[in-house]
A protein has these predicted regions:
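Beta-hairpin "wing" of winged helix-turn-helix
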Residues: 53-67
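Short alpha-helical segments that sit at the start of domains
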Residues: 1-13
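Conserved segment of winged-helix/HTH DNA-binding domains
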Residues: 70-96, 115
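A short alpha-helical element within helix-turn-helix/winged-helix DNA-binding domains
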Residues: 25-36
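Basic amphipathic alpha-helical segments that dock to polyanions
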Residues: 45-50
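Short amphipathic alpha-helical interface segments
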Residues: 11-22
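C-terminal regulatory/oligomerization modules of transcriptional regulators
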Residues: 92-165
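Short coil turns linking two alpha-helices in DNA-binding domains
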Residues: 38-41
């Protein structure tokens, strides 16, 4: 199973919208620069977030805003917005198992409950994390980068002799 980059792009977008809400014109181009992707991809993800009621967008520069506090936006909200939609199955079953085969005839009865249990645990874990958690970590990392010890360590890294190749 693999979740597409739309999920992490959406988390990045939401965190960046909040982080840069004061003093910046937050546009799809601005966000694309932060993410390192094409503005068209950003606009596609924003469309999904808007459809899920997480952001509001208006024509014109810097007219993107959060509709809920980041502490009220869970990873599950984001996942459902950009990946599956609400209430959709995580696992997709092959369409026509052979009813003449004992495995084919009984696969749904044997596997469906297990897959549902896995999905419920996955969704509960996603629901336990918020975008505010991510932004808090971003702020902590930024403070650490700005500390005198980090600046001093970075300066000493910059002046080290190059390694022999």
């Amino acid at each position: 199973m693999q979740i597409s980059t739309k999920f992490t792009i959406a988390i990045h977008l939401l965190a960046a919208i909040a982080y840069f809400s004061e003093g910046y014109r937050v546009t799809s181009e601005f966000l694309a620069g932060s993410i390192g992707t094409n503005p068209v991809i950003v606009r596609g993800v924003m469309l999904k977030l808007r459809g899920a009621g997480l952001i509001e967008t208006k024509r014109g520069p810097g007219s993107i805003r959060l509709l809920r506090p980041l502490s009220a936006i869970t990873f599950l909200d984001v996942y459902r917005a950009v990946e599956t939609g609400s209430g959709k199955a995580l696992f997709h079953f092959h369409e026509h198992p052979n009813p003449q085969c004992p495995v084919g005839r009984n696969i749904h009865r044997s596997l469906d409950g297990m897959l549902l249990d896995i999905q419920q645990r996955f969704e509960a874990d996603l629901a336990s994390h918020t975008v505010a958690d991510v932004l808090n970590r971003i702020h902590a990392c930024a403070r650490k980068e700005a500390s005198p010890a980090a600046t001093s360590a970075k300066a000493s890294e910059d002046i080290q002799a190059p390694k022999k190749g």
